[in-house]
């Protein structure tokens, strides 16, 4: 159900589970180089397409990777919202977001502000989450999974 239908942004965390057609799953460990680049899993790149977006994740210290379609659907879903609802979400999600296009080696660059928000060190885990992916610092992800 789109967030505009139930108004529960914390639950949806800015994602679009209604978009369908995408299946991402698995955990993939990678490293980030000194320029903020990482090899993005080929299996997930196939699902995301050639152009996608990376944003902060509401409620978690990780990053969300959106398809171009889901990113545009999120933008559209916010247009009719009152400013008191829309502006804080837009500032949080769009203000620090970056576009990603894998290079010939399959690497993507993650903006410094996004790396800082998620506490990304040189070791990260990319997690397939059905219709989107998340990028976590490896130690933070291990601590999170051990706590549940």
Question: What are these language model-derived features?
Answer:
Residues 1-30, 34, 43-100, 104-105, ...:
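Flexible "stalk/tail and boundary" regions
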